[in-house]
């Protein structure tokens, strides 16, 4: 399984978002409302109402940050970023092992992301656990860091033992649905851009960019 972690916003901006979320008193909902029938049985958290003024404001900020980041754009090839929500997990909250729905009312889920909004020392537990064939990856990032991973993976959120966990989650519908194809293109793009930075433009490099573009046309939706 290939996943990417990256700093999306700085810690100051992340703290400002958390403070806004904490100040919002009337727009929080039981997280079970947005889960499927099976997932609702194993999900406990609070989610900011997607239609609230604050949710729309913050969602636009996060989506714009993702699509304007060259590395994330190359890794995800985003056609649509959707289902973005802000969640709060208190002591005792968790989310058992589950798989994201392949198709949601808002779009197809090729990639899932979690943006950690508060510092890891602010809470105990609350790790994002992504299950692979051989092991379970436990991930708890610094404030402002994002992880993007295939929606095809089973994953869970460990129980929060102390403090509060604040994150933003969402899904990406990619122009290239297949994970292996998308990772291949990511490597090719990174290599070509590295050669461009090191050696400048050349006829040979133009052929590599041409190959990348035409492969994307063939593999894309």
Swiss-Prot record:
Fe2OG dioxygenase domain residues: 80-174
Binding annotation for Fe cation: 98, 100, 155
EC number: 1.14.11.-
Entries under Pfam families matching the protein: 2OG-FeII_Oxy_3
Cofactor requirement: Fe(2+); L-ascorbate
Residues where 2-oxoglutarate binds: 165
GO BP term, example: DNA damage response
Molecular-function annotations in GO: 2-oxoglutarate-dependent dioxygenase activity; iron ion binding; L-ascorbic acid binding
InterPro entries per UniProt: Oxoglu/Fe-dep_dioxygenase_dom (IPR005123), PKHD_hydroxylase (IPR023550), Pro_4_hyd_alph (IPR006620), Pro_4_hyd_alph_FE2OG_OXY (IPR044862)
Entry protein name: PKHD-type hydroxylase NATL1_16191
Source species: Prochlorococcus marinus (strain NATL1A)
UniProt lineage: Bacteria, Bacillati, Cyanobacteriota, Cyanophyceae, Synechococcales
């Amino acid at each position: 399984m290939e996943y990417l972690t990256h700093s999306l916003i700085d810690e100051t901006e992340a703290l400002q978002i958390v403070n806004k979320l904490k100040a919002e008193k009337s727009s929080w909902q039981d997280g079970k409302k947005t889960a499927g029938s099976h997932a609702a049985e194993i999900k406990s958290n609070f989610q900011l109402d997607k239609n609230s003024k604050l949710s729309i404001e913050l969602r636009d900020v996060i989506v714009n940050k993702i699509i304007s980041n060259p590395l994330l754009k190359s890794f995800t090839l985003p056609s649509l970023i959707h289902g973005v929500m802000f969640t709060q997990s208190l002591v005792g909250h968790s989310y058992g092992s589950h798989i994201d729905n392949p198709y949601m009312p808002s779009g197809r889920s090729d990639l899932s992301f979690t943006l950690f909004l508060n510092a890891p020392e602010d809470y105990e537990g609350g790790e994002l656990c992504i299950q692979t064939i051989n092991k379970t990856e436990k991930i708890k990032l610094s404030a402002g860091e994002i992880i993007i991973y295939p929606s095809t993976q089973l994953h869970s959120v460990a129980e929060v033992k102390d403090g509060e966990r604040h994150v933003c989650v969402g899904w990406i519908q990619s122009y290239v649905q297949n994970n292996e194809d998308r990772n291949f293109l990511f490597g090719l793009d990174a290599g070509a851009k590295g050669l461009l930075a090191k050696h400048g433009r050349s006829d040979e490099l133009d052929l590599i960019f041409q190959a990348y573009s035409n492969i994307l046309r063939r593999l894309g939706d």
